[in-house]
Amino acid sequence: MLNIGLSGSTGKMGGTILERIDKFKDCKIAAKFNSTNNLDDLDNFCKNSDVIIDFSTPEILEKLINYALKHNTKLVIGTTGLQPQHFKLLEKAAQTLPVLYSANMSIGANLLSYLAKEVTKILDDYDVEILETHHRNKKDSPSGTAVMLAETIASKKGLNITFNRGNRLRSEKEIGISSLRGGNVHGIHEISFLGDDEIITLKHEALNKNSFSIGAIKAAIWLQDKPSALYSMQDIYKI
């Protein structure tokens, strides 16, 4: 039985994971950590977990990694809003532990990323723009998924990513990300390839948080016997 530690257990994603975990017979939630805990509680939290699923805040990541290294606890990181220094911490930890990071753990969003990469190879001379829509209370903008998609495309086309074009004209070598916030939208991501004569749009819409939570649990199960490295959901789905 795989003992999973759930960081961010009282958040929306944490709640959904707790609702879905019984669907999986080979794992259980053995430890929980949330905003009511002291950071030093991460010590026992990591000690009692084989793999941690983290949907908390960037502020605790360094402490979480330190205790995970102490107890050789594997990490599945789904927290968004991470900055460059956080990714450096993940890369360093992955030299010792198996670490999986993804801004979006649903199979649909990762398939969208794969399709965008393939379309980019064919539509090399098309302009590319990304529009992401989320609920009114989402803190980070643009979404981590939108950044992931943009980075995937930009790496293939040699483009710069812009989040706020303002009043300036679109430059030839850029991919833009625009954000909408409102209602109770779980997440919509649209990638438009705009040519002179036609537009091709790829779209993924999450109808609820179930696909994210199922993906996170599958990631924890998959990671349990992997060697030290930094993984993504695309390693699981082999795309």
From Swiss-Prot:
<dbReference type="InterPro" id="IPR000846">
    <property type="entry name" value="DapB_N"/>
</dbReference>
<keyword id="KW-0457">Lysine biosynthesis</keyword>
<feature type="binding site">
    <location>
        <begin position="144"/>
        <end position="145"/>
    </location>
    <ligand>
        <name>(S)-2,3,4,5-tetrahydrodipicolinate</name>
    </ligand>
</feature>
<keyword id="KW-0963">Cytoplasm</keyword>
<feature type="binding site">
    <location>
        <position position="135"/>
    </location>
    <ligand>
        <name>(S)-2,3,4,5-tetrahydrodipicolinate</name>
    </ligand>
</feature>
<feature type="binding site">
    <location>
        <begin position="78"/>
        <end position="80"/>
    </location>
    <ligand>
        <name>NAD(+)</name>
    </ligand>
</feature>
<feature type="active site" description="Proton donor">
    <location>
        <position position="138"/>
    </location>
</feature>
<dbReference type="GO" id="GO:0005829">
    <property type="term" value="C:cytosol"/>
</dbReference>
<dbReference type="GO" id="GO:0008839">
    <property type="term" value="F:4-hydroxy-tetrahydrodipicolinate reductase"/>
</dbReference>
<keyword id="KW-0560">Oxidoreductase</keyword>
<feature type="active site" description="Proton donor/acceptor">
    <location>
        <position position="134"/>
    </location>
</feature>
<dbReference type="GO" id="GO:0016726">
    <property type="term" value="F:oxidoreductase activity, acting on CH or CH2 groups, NAD or NADP as acceptor"/>
</dbReference>
<dbReference type="GO" id="GO:0009089">
    <property type="term" value="P:lysine biosynthetic process via diaminopimelate"/>
</dbReference>
<comment type="pathway">
    <text>Amino-acid biosynthesis; L-lysine biosynthesis via DAP pathway; (S)-tetrahydrodipicolinate from L-aspartate: step 4/4.</text>
</comment>
<protein>
    <recommendedName>
        <fullName>4-hydroxy-tetrahydrodipicolinate reductase</fullName>
        <ecNumber>1.17.1.8</ecNumber>
    </recommendedName>
</protein>
<dbReference type="InterPro" id="IPR023940">
    <property type="entry name" value="DHDPR_bac"/>
</dbReference>
<keyword id="KW-0520">NAD</keyword>
<dbReference type="Pfam" id="PF05173">
    <property type="entry name" value="DapB_C"/>
</dbReference>
<feature type="binding site">
    <location>
        <begin position="102"/>
        <end position="105"/>
    </location>
    <ligand>
        <name>NAD(+)</name>
    </ligand>
</feature>
<dbReference type="GO" id="GO:0050661">
    <property type="term" value="F:NADP binding"/>
</dbReference>
<dbReference type="Pfam" id="PF01113">
    <property type="entry name" value="DapB_N"/>
</dbReference>
<dbReference type="InterPro" id="IPR022664">
    <property type="entry name" value="DapB_N_CS"/>
</dbReference>
<keyword id="KW-0028">Amino-acid biosynthesis</keyword>
<dbReference type="InterPro" id="IPR022663">
    <property type="entry name" value="DapB_C"/>
</dbReference>
<feature type="binding site">
    <location>
        <begin position="8"/>
        <end position="13"/>
    </location>
    <ligand>
        <name>NAD(+)</name>
    </ligand>
</feature>
<comment type="similarity">
    <text>Belongs to the DapB family.</text>
</comment>
<dbReference type="InterPro" id="IPR036291">
    <property type="entry name" value="NAD(P)-bd_dom_sf"/>
</dbReference>
<keyword id="KW-0220">Diaminopimelate biosynthesis</keyword>
<comment type="function">
    <text>Catalyzes the conversion of 4-hydroxy-tetrahydrodipicolinate (HTPA) to tetrahydrodipicolinate.</text>
</comment>
<dbReference type="GO" id="GO:0051287">
    <property type="term" value="F:NAD binding"/>
</dbReference>
<keyword id="KW-0521">NADP</keyword>
<dbReference type="GO" id="GO:0019877">
    <property type="term" value="P:diaminopimelate biosynthetic process"/>
</dbReference>
